[in-house]
Amino acid sequence: MFQAIKAKYIITPDQSFLTNSAVIINNNIISGIIPNYQLTRKKYKVIDLKNSVLLPGFINSHVHLELHWTQKLLNPFNSFPDWLNQIISLKKNFDNSKISNSVKKGLDESLNSGVTTIGEISSYDGLDYKAIIKSGIRTAYFYEIANSTILNIESKFLKGLLQNTNSLFNLKIFPHSIYSLDTKSLKKVLAFAKKHNTQLGIHLSESVDEINYAMKKKNNLEDKVFSKFNSKPKFDSRPSTPLEYLDRINLFRQIITLVHMNNLSSEDLKILKKRQYPVVICPRSNLYLNQKLPNLRFFMNYKKTGLGTDGLSSNISINFLDEINFLYLNAKKILINNPERRILEIATLGGAKALGLDNSIGSIEKNKKADLIAFDLKNKDPYLSVMHSNSGDLKMSMIDGKIIKLK
């Protein structure tokens, strides 16, 4: 029997909305949207969400669930290198229970804020894996590599993941950054991803110190952070911006999701327009780490922009509604007409594009996966209603056709 999900408003792929309609689901696939008068109890199992807005599930395109536990242990810091120094030290003193509990708490916060897909960064060779699989959340699983873990590309766990990708679990490779990998090692990671046909991601242009490092200027990464590494990374490049450097060594024009991108030159913007790299912005994290916001005027109009919370190591929450509301308040100055519509697109279809999953999720369309959420109406405008929502307003959450929450 087909499922029919009714709601007062349904957000459509063109960011308009339908009324008096229902989304039809066959197993885990969206079959289409039909008017309510066509529904019959004999053919459809009807779920009536009444006075609510139904939309695609949110996609948190960049998060570190495994680092939840670090939030309580961080000391005040004045710069990005000071913060990174602490994170490196803390990560060396982990235990399995800390990681497991962190991931479970992070998953609860994510699901309760309407997230149905995450772009999880995993740096502990799979300690977050079981909890993620058990939760049922759709996952783009970015396996993180740095100089210190470069041998992990030969690990049994990673080789197993390459064989076990499915519709709910999609493996990707994540070289941590240009400053945590030798040029030779970064090229090796790119080649590995090319061989196995996997998408990549990387933290890029996140701090002024990273920019200065790539430009071979004085920076506090070399002064304060590299002493934590076993050896200083070998950066074999002429002075360049991080994006110029990465683009130059990306010889096979692989898809690389660029995370943060809040310190960009005019040349960087030209490269983005030309190459169309997917980008994930994490604006609250940038402010938390004493950095400037991304160029919202550019990214609000860039078609492959996704939104991420980052982790609790660099944010005050991973509640995705908090991230959406923050972006909304800052975007109102840039997009005069209906910024809330574009923000919801970034939080859904934009995230799917950033993770390379837009053929299957991110919008309510025929033949896409049934990843849906609904919120109680708080405003006569369905878009503003979502902007004004909190976790308590989440009425329904569905992942892959299975209801996770219904009130």
Model segments located where?
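Histidine/acidic residue-rich metal-binding segments in metalloenzymes
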Residues: K130-I133, S155-P278, N290-T305, N359
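Histidine-centered catalytic micro-motifs
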Residues: P56-H68, Q199-V208
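C-terminal cap of metal-dependent C-N hydrolases
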Residues: K8, K369-K407
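His/Asp/Glu-enriched, well-ordered alpha-helical/loop segment
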Residues: R248-L251, P294-L377, S389
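N-terminal metal-binding scaffold of metallo-dependent hydrolase/deaminase domains
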Residues: M1-R41, S52, L357, P382, ...
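Alpha-helical scaffold segments that flank or form the walls of functional sites
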Residues: V53, Q71-I137, L158-N166
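Active-site beta-loop-alpha junctions enriched in small/polar residues
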Residues: H64, S123-Y124, E144-S148, H176-I178, ...
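Active-site gating loops and adjacent loop-to-helix segments of metal-dependent hydrolytic enzymes
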Residues: W69-S100, A140-Y143, V208-R253, L327-N337
